[in-house]
Swiss-Prot record:
Belongs to the peptidase A1 family. This is Pregnancy-associated glycoprotein 62A. GO terms for molecular function: aspartic-type endopeptidase activity. GO terms for biological process: proteolysis. Expressed in placenta, specifically the fetal cotyledonary tissue (FCT) (at protein level). Its main location: secreted. It is found in: Secreted, Extracellular space. Keywords: Aspartyl protease, Hydrolase, Protease, Secreted. The keyword Hydrolase applies. It comes from Dama dama. GO terms for cellular component: extracellular region.
């Protein structure tokens, strides 16, 4: 699952 946000990138 990958989620990209304007302030932070989170990869789990």
């Amino acid at each position: 699952y990958q989620k990209s946000s304007p302030g932070s990138n989170i990869t789990t």
